[in-house]
Amino acid sequence: MGIGYGASDEQLEKQIGCVKYTLFCFNIVAWMISTALFALTVWLRAEPGFNDWLRILEAQSFYIGVYVLIGISIVMMAVSFLGCLSALMENTLALFVFVGTQVFGFIAIVAGSAVLLQFSTINSSLQPLLNVSLRGFVATSEYTYSNYVLTMIQENIGCCGATGPWDYLDLRQPLPSSCRDTVSGNAFFNGCVDELTWFFEGKTGWIVALAMTLGLLNVICAVMSFVLVQAVKKEEEQASNYRR
């Protein structure tokens, strides 16, 4: 009887050790991803040219999702240390707190990513904002500032008007040279709303992918922490029965 119990106890101890150190490694990876997410989101927020374009086009609501992801990446960097400590100490209370933070982190990451995509993809809330701003610039393209903004965007992105060259015709404005391909001389077919949206998608794609990877790690860490809690409780029960 004693031999059987000892073998079972040893097997449980090995299982706890396996889960504990696997959870520790996952937390290290989560910390690295959180750090990378923080760096990318801060870089996106601080990039001068990108920031200027959003300010000029009055589309700074794009940054709402970025702010959410900056905040959650900071929280997740700190929480990863809590996860490492709670796993190594096998403290059930700390592990339950850690599970709660992982659930919160997952929800916040999904929300932040959803908001960021809502303001950076085709058919998103960003496009009506860009359309209003760009049509306003086209309607007043005879003024120096409007002409400067349109030239900057159309030459750099390779687009024309808000939805296409017909915007200038609809608003009775001459088609500027910045709307034409320098090689063929033909007007760019695509409007700047779609081209800018594709440009923003390229900027945010990696960030959202990284954020969702972190969210997946949150789920894995939460499940493993719960498994570790149950294993530690079982070990404590076995130890209590053995003492009796």
UniProtKB/Swiss-Prot annotation:
Record gene name: Tsp2A
Keywords recorded for this protein, A-Z: Cell junction, Cell membrane, Membrane, Transmembrane, Transmembrane helix
Originating species: Drosophila melanogaster
Assembly: Forms a complex with Ssk and mesh.
Stretches assigned to the Extracellular side: 44-61, 113-206
Keyword Transmembrane assigned: yes
Stored InterPro entries: Tetraspanin/Peripherin (IPR018499), Tetraspanin_animals (IPR000301), Tetraspanin_EC2_sf (IPR008952)
Record protein name field: Tetraspanin-2A
Role this protein plays: Required for assembly of smooth septate junctions (sSJs), together with Ssk and mesh. Important for barrier function of the midgut epithelium.
GO cellular component: apicolateral plasma membrane; membrane; plasma membrane; smooth septate junction
